[in-house]
Amino acid sequence: MLSSVRLAALRAGKTNSVFQAVRAFAAEPAAAATTDAGFVSQVIGPVVDVRFDGELPSILSALEVQGHNVRLVLEVAQHMGDNTVRCVAMDSTDGLVRGQKVVNTGSPIKVPVGRGTLGRIMNVIGEPVDEQGPIECSEVWSIHREAPEFTEQSTEQEILVTGIKVVDLLAPYQRGGKIGLFGGAGVGKTVLIMELINNVAKAHGGFSVFAGVGERTREGNDLYREMIESGVIKLGDKRGESKCTLVYGQMNEPPGARARVALTGLTVAEYFRDVEGQDVLLFVDNIFRFTQANSEVSALLGRIPSAVGYQPTLATDLGGLQERITTTTKGSITSVQAVYVPADDLTDPAPATTFAHLDATTVLSRSIAELGIYPAVDPLDSTSRMLNPNIIGAEHYNIARGVQKVLQDYKNLQDIIAILGMDELSEEDKLTVARARKIQRFLSQPFQVAEVFTGTPGKYVDLKDTISAFTGILQGKYDDLPEMAFYMVGGIHEVVEKADKLAKDVAARKDESKKAKSSEALKDVPSLEKMAGEIKDEVIDADDSLEEDFKAEAISSENMVLNEKGEKVPLPKK
């Protein structure tokens, strides 16, 4: 137990400075206490119990610990009885001790909103973390807000063109809808999100908000640098021309920050939608980490785990976030959410619960990534409720279904091909396989954000060009072109150009091969003079041999032989 002197000192704010660090550009000090101050009674990792002598703060109220150079915000999660509230910390609790003074701000966590946030990076409590000075905003909003009323929501349906062929053709995104990117580790979710930010910002204008929830700090830094290079974010005097706000609560943050940073990003987006009437893009990478962070603190809050160890309030937590992402009569929020799939299991409770809220799903497949086809979008598993002839038109719908049919037929034939080989297929099936392989490769596309890694310039493909190209493939206009011509290109005109280039390269290689073979053959053939000399020598040798044979026969006919001196002598008598 603490001594009464020590406890009094702690309550007075005289705390040990061990573990305390000065955070540059910290937000303003805590608001004056609206009720009696409390003090820390228990610390269990990210969960802190605070005891109040007077009126208790309400659920979701923000409390601030006094005596820390680092601003430490606690959010009330439970009333425990005995004048004690249980809170979740938004930052590390290292150095926090029992008896430390805590004040109630009288409101939930509030963050700055408005154009002053554009081009800036903030954390879960609205503090800037980009070392660019304080965020200048005239308004602050609570991160806990009600979803728009049903009467305020819009029912209009319109496609958001992304410039990515496989998405626009087979699983188009709805403007003001919720889209999920499903995939395991390392199949390209973050790269696809970065490309979407790049394409939509350049093609459509408008503002974007990126919420980094529990992902790699390196990726967050890379995204920030690439946005600066591409002009989406501008620094200095031109910061007001920036098109994106970044809100980060990365892997190294405590679970409290990761559980609330998505709400902070959503609040910034809601301001642009409701006050400025903007069509806003909200990117969340990764929504699974939101669920995971709530799961981490759930047991410490005394909740009984449900399936696979997730919190029992999984559906409620996720629903509260997703219902705020919608289109109203004032503006829209289109949300693209990366969803990590644990062990590639789509039946896991976290991704399965997320499915219910989405208008479109883009499933990234490891088997397609292993073929070297990027983006590794599965054209058969990805879905969209926008793929409706009444919304996108009959032509787009028929071409999309035709492409999926060819790919499905190819998938059904793969077992036969693996066992019996291509030769056993009918001519019709062979044609289906050939077209399916071309479609599969044509669905690949070089990304602008990946240009520094691949060396291939990125491509933005208009929806009309995409539909026209796949129409030609299904009709057999490009059956004579090689498969490789369809790989990692933009429009169909690039396929034709690449096929011509490949044909010229093959012809050039054949000519070089013929020349090399003829030169090698000439090297092997001896010169005519050498051959004539060799023939002459052989003739002379043959003549000498014949002459000796004739002499021997003549001598033998005279019953004479040659002795050692070469003189004729009579044959010896028997």
Curated annotation (Swiss-Prot):
Its catalytic activity?
ATP + H2O + 4 H(+)(in) = ADP + phosphate + 5 H(+)(out)
Q: Which SMART domains match?
A: AAA (SM00382)
- Sorted alphabetically, which keywords does the UniProt record give? ATP synthesis, ATP-binding, CF(1), Hydrogen ion transport, Ion transport, Membrane, Mitochondrion, Mitochondrion inner membrane, Nucleotide-binding, Transit peptide, Translocase, Transport
User: What is the enzyme's class at the highest EC level?
Assistant: translocase
Q: Transit peptide positions?
A: 1-26
Q: Which domain of life is it from?
A: Eukaryota
Keyword Mitochondrion in the entry? The reply is: yes
Question: Which SUPFAM superfamilies does the UniProt entry name for this protein?
Answer: C-terminal domain of alpha and beta subunits of F1 ATP synthase, N-terminal domain of alpha and beta subunits of F1 ATP synthase, P-loop containing nucleoside triphosphate hydrolases
GO molecular function terms listed in the Swiss-Prot or TrEMBL record? ATP binding; ATP hydrolysis activity; proton-transporting ATP synthase activity, rotational mechanism
Binding positions (ATP): 183-190
Primary localization class, coarse? mitochondrion
A single GO CC term for this protein reads:
mitochondrial inner membrane
| Subcellular location field | Mitochondrion; Mitochondrion inner membrane
Signal peptide range equals none
Cite the EC number.
7.1.2.2
What exactly does this protein do? Mitochondrial membrane ATP synthase (F(1)F(0) ATP synthase or Complex V) produces ATP from ADP in the presence of a proton gradient across the membrane which is generated by electron transport complexes of the respiratory chain. F-type ATPases consist of two structural domains, F(1) - containing the extramembraneous catalytic core, and F(0) - containing the membrane proton channel, linked together by a central stalk and a peripheral stalk. During catalysis, ATP synthesis in the catalytic domain of F(1) is coupled via a rotary mechanism of the central stalk subunits to proton translocation.
**Entries under NCBIfam families matching the protein:** atpD
Question: What family does this belong to?
Answer: Belongs to the ATPase alpha/beta chains family.
Q: Which HAMAP family match?
A: ATP_synth_beta_bact
Assembly and partners are described as: F-type ATPases have 2 components, CF(1) - the catalytic core - and CF(0) - the membrane proton channel. CF(1) has five subunits: alpha(3), beta(3), gamma(1), delta(1), epsilon(1). CF(0) has three main subunits: a, b and c.
The entry's protein name is: ATP synthase subunit beta, mitochondrial
Q: Which organism is it from?
A: Chlamydomonas reinhardtii (Chlamydomonas smithii)
